[in-house]
């Protein structure tokens, strides 16, 4: 029964784990960290203790008389206590871990979720606030645009403008007055020079008055930016004081008569008619853009722009009213005044560009046949040409009368030079030189590439041919003078000019003719200057001497060009008989695969006879290894020493293989199809660097393979591995592998 009771006690001990938790909780909490580490260790220890107890249970009834406490106290009692402690610790740890997990799962997730929720709410609020701010920003912009377009509804010119300009106190008096009062106002600053502030307040309205009257014809909604501009000028004049005001009075006195002349030529009746009728025809955003550009691009403290704008806009209005000569005279006067102003080049450039912007805007209606963009560039060029053209008194009426006609002659074809910003300053000087030189020569030689296509535009009545054909003639000169960069087929195909000796084409002008728009054939022919395909193209035929020379040295271009021009002049009759220009004489399709022919033995065949025979082509074809100067020596024998200095032989261009081996062009780096028989038959020069078939492990590494491998001297031998795992090959692994298994 005791044993049964003990067994029941054992069973009760397993059930009493939860009962001892309350009593031993303090001690178990102290020994938590010392005794136990993980739940797996607890289970294993508990199982071991239970097994030990079960083994010792039958030994306990041997001493039943001693009593159960005696038997429990020495050994079994300690074990029971240990079992109890372990059970308590297990229960405590399991409960504590479960509670901690529950607490950690409950507590940290709630604040994180709360923070995320609050953050999302805040972000949504911020986004809504930004949207509200954007809506607030958009609404006044739309209101401003509506107010900006409002003056178009009240366009009655005599009544509308005083209403627009009555708000600033500065502009009320001069606008109501006519041009007679503007003269008196312009005369005022001379008397008020010791008072610069009064002159600064009275001077901008006097300048803005005529400008207001004239720009209202073109752009009625210009009231607000001009108003802000006058205030800006007044503040800057307060800063600059006396010397700036004196200089401005001189400018105003010089240009007062000019603006009055431009305003008095068209009568007041066409002014009113153009005021009333023009804003209906013209769209509003274009004048607004012009006004904004002028306010932004105005240099600080430079008030001459106002009178210039008034004069140019006055000439534009006179164009619309039908008086065309007055606009020419106004532009001429404005250009003269512009050239005499003591200002920097940048200010003069901005003034010419501004006048060029207003000029085509008005004259575009007079010439609707020409495209708008082309004529804008052309008129901008014309104003730039007038500024310098009137200083040496070269006749300026010829470009003024011819340039509106040149867009009709040549259509939308414009050189890319007109788009460069340098032409506002440089083209006018070159144009003046072209006026002086077009009387003597048909085409004068210059060092600047921009000047060549512009002569035909402004030539005096001697040049009758339109620019379209003349630019083609300029392009057709280049294959005769730039034969150096062309293929041998096109060497003598371009027609040389009939009455021009070779001295008139200097190397610089003809070399830089590539700035012009070139046809596709010449574009392809000029590529081998920098492309790596020029070396195989040199191997096509012995007639490709100039391309070889370009690859040898660029310093010899001038001498070769001088020689080739004489040859082309000698062979010009054959080229002219065919009548091939640079656009028509494209290289035949047979020359394209020849450029990629790498074998020098097959290139000794004669080239296709697509071009006329010149002086150099009439010679016998020399072998491939001859010098290029020998090929060229028949055409020009006066400079053989210069040709011999920097020439490259063909054997330097190609690496000559050995006599017994194959050509190196056919020798691959990695050859997958070589057999040892073919490799031994061929010389060692044609062995591949890596051979994947001869040195495979399948081929036995016997005495036959190793001397062949020594003869080859290959870089990588994939047949002998560094690590070999087969135990059968241990005898052979003594030499090659690093590790054995």
UniProtKB/Swiss-Prot annotation:
Biased composition (Basic and acidic residues): 131-147
InterPro entries, A to Z: DDA3/GTSE-1 (IPR026657), GTSE1_N (IPR032768)
Pfam families: GTSE1_N
Cytoplasm found in the keyword field: yes
GO CC term (a single one): cytoplasmic microtubule
Positions of modified residues (Phosphoserine): 73, 139, 153, 191, 245, 311, 460, 476, 493, 509, 514, 521, 541, 582, 599, 720, 726, 736
Organism domain of life: Eukaryota
Region (Disordered): 101-120, 131-428, 450-512, 550-640
Biased composition (Low complexity): 310-321, 360-372, 478-497, 578-593
Phosphothreonine found at: 465, 518, 696
Task performed by this protein: May be involved in p53-induced cell cycle arrest in G2/M phase by interfering with microtubule rearrangements that are required to enter mitosis. Overexpression delays G2/M phase progression.
UniProt name for this protein: G2 and S phase-expressed protein 1
Biological source species: Mus musculus (Mouse)
């Amino acid at each position: 029964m005791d044993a049964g009771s003990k067994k029941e006690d054992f069973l009760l001990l397993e059930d009493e784990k939860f009962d001892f938790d309350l009593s031993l909780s303090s001690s178990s909490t102290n020994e938590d960290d010392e005794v136990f580490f993980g739940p797996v260790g607890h289970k294993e220890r508990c199982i071991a203790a239970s097994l030990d107890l079960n083994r010792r249970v039958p030994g306990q009834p041997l001493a039943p008389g001693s009593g159960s406490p005696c038997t429990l106290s020495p050994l079994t009692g300690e074990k029971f206590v240990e079992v109890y402690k372990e059970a308590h610790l297990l229960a405590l740890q399991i409960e504590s871990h479960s509670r901690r997990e529950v607490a950690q799962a409950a507590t940290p997730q709630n604040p994180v979720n709360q923070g995320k929720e609050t953050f999302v709410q805040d972000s949504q609020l911020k986004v809504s606030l930004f949207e509200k701010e954007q809506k607030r920003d958009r609404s006044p912009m739309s209101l401003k645009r509506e107010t900006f377009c409002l003056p178009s509804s009240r366009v009655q010119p005599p009544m509308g403008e005083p209403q627009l300009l009555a708000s600033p106190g500065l502009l009320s008096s001069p606008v109501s007055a006519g041009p007679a009062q503007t003269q008196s106002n312009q005369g005022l600053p001379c008397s008020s020079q010791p008072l610069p502030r009064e002159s600064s307040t009275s001077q901008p309205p006097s300048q803005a008055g005529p400008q207001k009257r004239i720009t209202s014809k073109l752009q009625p909604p210009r009231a607000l930016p001009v108003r802000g501009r006058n205030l800006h000028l007044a503040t800057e004049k307060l800063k600059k004081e006396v010397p700036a005001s004196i200089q401005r009075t001189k400018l105003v006195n010089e240009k007062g008569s000019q603006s009055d002349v431009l305003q008095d030529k068209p009568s007041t009746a066409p002014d009113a008619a153009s005021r009333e009728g023009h804003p209906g025809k013209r769209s509003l955003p274009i004048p607004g853009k012009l006004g904004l550009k002028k306010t932004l691009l105005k240099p600080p403290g430079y008030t001459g722009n106002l009178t210039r704008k008034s004069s140019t806009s006055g000439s534009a209005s006179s164009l619309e009213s039908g008086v065309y000569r007055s606009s020419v005279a106004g532009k001429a006067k404005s250009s003269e005044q512009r050239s005499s102003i003591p200002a920097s080049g940048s200010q003069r450039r901005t003034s010419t560009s501004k006048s060029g912007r207003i000029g085509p805007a008005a004259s575009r209606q007079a010439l609707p046949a020409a495209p708008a963009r082309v004529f804008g560039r052309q008129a901008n060029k014309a104003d730039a040409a007038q500024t310098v053209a009137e200083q040496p008194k070269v006749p300026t009426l010829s470009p003024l009368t011819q340039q509106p006609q040149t867009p009709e002659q040549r259509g939308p074809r414009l050189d890319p030079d007109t788009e460069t910003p340098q032409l506002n300053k440089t083209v006018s000087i070159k144009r003046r030189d072209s006026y002086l030189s077009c009387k003597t020569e048909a085409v004068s030689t210059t060092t600047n590439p921009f000047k060549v296509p512009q002569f035909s535009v402004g030539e005096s009545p001697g040049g009758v041919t339109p620019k379209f054909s003349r630019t083609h003639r300029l392009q057709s000169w280049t294959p005769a003078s730039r034969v150096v960069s062309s293929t041998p087929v096109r060497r003598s195909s371009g027609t040389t000019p009939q009455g021009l000796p070779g001295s008139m084409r200097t190397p610089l002008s003809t070399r830089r003719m590539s700035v012009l728009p070139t046809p596709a054939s010449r574009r392809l022919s000029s590529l081998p200057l920098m492309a790596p395909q020029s070396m195989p193209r040199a191997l096509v035929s012995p007639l490709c001497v100039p391309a070889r020379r370009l690859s040898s040295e660029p310093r010899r271009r001038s001498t070769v060009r001088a020689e080739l021009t004489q040859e082309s002049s000698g062979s010009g009759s054959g080229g002219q008989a065919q009548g091939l220009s640079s656009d028509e004489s494209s290289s035949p399709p047979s020359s394209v695969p020849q450029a990629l022919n790498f074998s020098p033995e097959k290139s000794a065949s004669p080239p296709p006879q697509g071009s006329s025979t010149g002086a150099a082509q009439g010679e016998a074809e020399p072998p491939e290894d001859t010098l290029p100067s020998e090929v060229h020596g028949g055409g020009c024998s006066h400079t053989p020493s210069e040709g011999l200095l920097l020439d490259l032989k063909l054997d330097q261009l190609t690496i000559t293989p050995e006599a017994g081996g194959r050509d190196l062009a056919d020798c691959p780096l990695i050859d997958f199809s070589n057999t040892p028989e073919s490799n031994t038959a061929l010389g060692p020069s044609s062995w591949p660097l890596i051979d994947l078939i001869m040195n495979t492990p399948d081929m036995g590494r016997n005495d036959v393979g190793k001397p062949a491998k020594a003869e080859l001297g290959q870089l990588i031998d994939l047949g002998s591995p560094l690590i070999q795992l087969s135990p059968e090959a241990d005898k052979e692994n003594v030499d090659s592998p690093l590790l054995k298994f």
